[in-house]
Amino acid sequence: MEIRGHQYTSAQGIATVSNTTPVEIIAGVAGKTLYLNYISISISDAAAASGELTDGSGGTAFWKQELIATGLEGPTSMMLNYGEYGLALTEDNGLFGTTTDAGLDYTVTALGYYK
């Protein structure tokens, strides 16, 4: 990936999150910072629960969505766009997803780069 004339290693991941145990979406790399450019979230099965994307396993949640099962009609999706430079996670950390209830299923597709 090229940003303003500099080459960086691209990072991408896709994972289904359906558990309270953190699921790794993009692995962290020792000594590198993961910058996230785009994240697509597709919610296919909802329960009254929250979904979170975190900076590392058990780290700080930078995206959290509470869902109420009643009133959710069919699948829903969200797109997070952090632009050309991206959202920086903590050095060495990867992108993880979790839920507060095993009844909530969502799929995350994420694109970024390591610097």
PLM feature spans:
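Beta-sandwich interaction modules
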Residues: 71-94, 100
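Short, surface-exposed beta-strand/strand-loop-strand elements in extracellular ectodomains
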Residues: 45-65
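C-terminal interaction-tip segments
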Residues: 1-34, 38, 92, 98-115
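Solvent-exposed serine/threonine-rich low-complexity stretches and specific carbohydrate-binding patches
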Residues: 11-13, 62-71
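Short conserved beta-strand and strand-loop elements enriched in small hydrophobics
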Residues: 52-56, 94-99
